[in-house]
A protein has these predicted regions:
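N-terminal soluble domains immediately following signal/targeting peptides that reside
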Residues: 20-138
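Bacterial N-terminal signal peptides
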Residues: 8-17
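Bacterial N-terminal signal peptides that target proteins for export
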Residues: 1-8
Length: 138
C-alpha cells in the first residue's frame, strides 16, 4: 500500500515537471537601463527584455500563449502597486508604466508570466511628489 502511494506521488511530480518544461521553462529579465529619478504621483516607464532560458528573447510560447510580464512593487508599509507590461515591436522587449503613490523605498520584481523565474531588482528610491506648478494669474 505504501509503495503504491509513493508511486502515485512520483508520477504526479513527473507530470508537474513535464508541464513546466512544455510551458517554456524559465526566463530572466534584463533592464534596458538603470532606473532614473522617480517621483511619487508621476508615471515611470521601464523597458526590459525577457530572455527564455537566459538567452533567447521571447514574446510568446506558441499560438495563444503570450508572455505577459507583471511588475510588482511593495513599500515598507506593505502598499503594493502592479503594472502589466506590454510588448513592443522588438521580440522579447516589453515596457511597463507604473505610478508610485508615495515616496520612499520600494522593493520590486518582474514576473515573466507564464514562465518561471521572477527577477528581483535593487530597491527603488521614489522621491517626494513635485510641487504643483503655480496657476497663471490672469
Amino acid at each position: 500500500m505504501k509503495r503504491a502511494s509513493v508511486l502515485v506521488i512520483v508520477v504526479m511530480a513527473l507530470l508537474a515537471t513535464t508541464a513546466a518544461v512544455l510551458a517554456g521553462g524559465w526566463a530572466v529579465v534584463t533592464l534596458d537601463s538603470p532606473p532614473g529619478e522617480i517621483h511619487a504621483g508621476e508615471p515611470w516607464t521601464v523597458g526590459f527584455t525577457v530572455l527564455q532560458h537566459g538567452q533567447t528573447p521571447v514574446h510568446n510560447l506558441g499560438p495563444g500563449s503570450p508572455v505577459e510580464p507583471l511588475l510588482i512593487a511593495t513599500n515598507a508599509d506593505g502598499r503594493r502597486v502592479e503594472a502589466q507590461a506590454t510588448p513592443t515591436e522588438e521580440v522579447g522587449h516589453f515596457v511597463a508604466e507604473v505610478t508610485f503613490p508615495s515616496e520612499g523605498s520600494w522593493e520590486w520584481t518582474i514576473h515573466p508570466n507564464p514562465l518561471a523565474g521572477e527577477s528581483l531588482f535593487e530597491p527603488l528610491t521614489v522621491m517626494a511628489a513635485r510641487p504643483a506648478a503655480a496657476e497663471a494669474v490672469v
